[in-house]
Amino acid sequence: MTKKRVVVTGLGALSPLGNDVDTSWNNAINGVSGIGPITRVDAEEYPAKVAAELKDFNVEDYMDKKEARKMDRFTQYAVVAAKMAVEDADLNITDEIAPRVGVWVGSGIGGLETLESQFEIFLTKGPRRVSPFFVPMMIPDMATGQISIALGAKGVNSCTVTACATGTNSIGDAFKVIQRGDADVMVTGGTEAPLTRMSFAGFSANKALSTNPDPKTASRPFDKNRDGFVMGEGAGIIVLEELEHALARGAKIYGEIVGYGSTGDAYHITAPAQDGEGGARAMQEAIKDAGIAPEEIDYINAHGTSTYYNDKYETMAIKTVFGEHAHKLAVSSTKSMTGHLLGAAGGIEAIFSILAIKEGVIPPTINIQTPDEECDLDYVPDEARRQELNYVLSNSLGFGGHNATLIFKKYQS
């Protein structure tokens, strides 16, 4: 069976770099950091002092207050970004096409803020005072459910939860839905709102977060002095569309998605497999799925979390897959500016990968001040680079040994 071609026709984002795609992208290519002092929780209680928060976001600017109160923050972000993406795609979801329009949006954690607040009510006021909206606000699939309701999309409706690989897995899974003919359009990506007391406590306890108090330099992927990731929030949603469907309605096309790889480490609950073996296989699977040679990849948007082992092993994985070509590749981590959006990271980074192809600009890795001999690739330090790109690869790796890779291509008719 001939695989259907799948293109990207819409983008929507809420990120620490901006409350829309254009602002987020322009800040990324200008090396602007979206990281600042923690305001959502009392920083005095935690070793980590900085976070990548949304700025000046008021959900009532985007939806009715009554509806917003029925959603956890992660769902609010997803619905807002999805509406942006569909509007950008100029897609009118009529009753006729609704059964062929699906939603596949994931969250690595779900409604942790709701869980914390309702558990406090449970403890202090008793079980009868817990909100009837507690469960439907908390569960991770509710972002997809609320997007489906908001858009009137009645096709495939699913949710992936693979920790920090969630956004990338979601897009890859949605890509395959269209490729095999089960939908014409998929609204897909990732969302996360993890800036809560328990989340900071948990990630601090396992030593994952940077304790650098300087917001400008705390997230420093591939730098010798990196000491952990900076937690962030937001949503990145894209519209995937079967090519003929997009052409028939005259849609603008940002680029094409051509490859997806997904593997498991079977190694450790939080640490990546030694030498990046699982990540290497995910990249190899995606390259095979795309039907291209490794040497055709021009740029890698790395997972690049600013943790010691991730950056070391991802570098090793890239060398395993690409051999000599690894040193000719441009590799950058936009997490140096956005922080780590966990389940939303893959969605935002897919958008940056797509725009890198469309605009011919590679966003930089900022804060590489002290080179690490174990991280010796071209990480596009400090300044964006103009370069024609035909194929871009994006990696996401998650707790539990989840590895996911997407490959995007410059669209050619």
UniProtKB/Swiss-Prot annotation:
It catalyses: a fatty acyl-[ACP] + malonyl-[ACP] + H(+) = a 3-oxoacyl-[ACP] + holo-[ACP] + CO2; (9Z)-hexadecenoyl-[ACP] + malonyl-[ACP] + H(+) = 3-oxo-(11Z)-octadecenoyl-[ACP] + holo-[ACP] + CO2. Its EC number is 2.3.1.179. Residues 3-410 form the Ketosynthase family 3 (KS3) domain. GO terms for biological process: fatty acid biosynthetic process. It comes from the Bacteria. The active site is at residues 164, 303, 340. Pathway: Lipid metabolism; fatty acid biosynthesis. PROSITE patterns: KS3_1, KS3_2. One of its GO terms (cellular component) is cytosol. Keywords: Acyltransferase, Fatty acid biosynthesis, Fatty acid metabolism, Lipid biosynthesis, Lipid metabolism, Transferase. GO terms for molecular function: 3-oxoacyl-[acyl-carrier-protein] synthase activity. Inhibited by cerulenin. InterPro entries: 3-oxoacyl-ACP_synth-2, Beta-ketoacyl_synthase, Ketoacyl_synth_AS, Ketoacyl_synth_C, Ketoacyl_synth_N, PKS_Beta-ketoAc_synthase_dom, Thiolase-like. Belongs to the thiolase-like superfamily. Beta-ketoacyl-ACP synthases family. Involved in the type II fatty acid elongation cycle. Catalyzes the elongation of a wide range of acyl-ACP by the addition of two carbons from malonyl-ACP to an acyl acceptor. Can efficiently catalyze the conversion of palmitoleoyl-ACP (cis-hexadec-9-enoyl-ACP) to cis-vaccenoyl-ACP (cis-octadec-11-enoyl-ACP), an essential step in the thermal regulation of fatty acid composition. This is 3-oxoacyl-[acyl-carrier-protein] synthase 2.
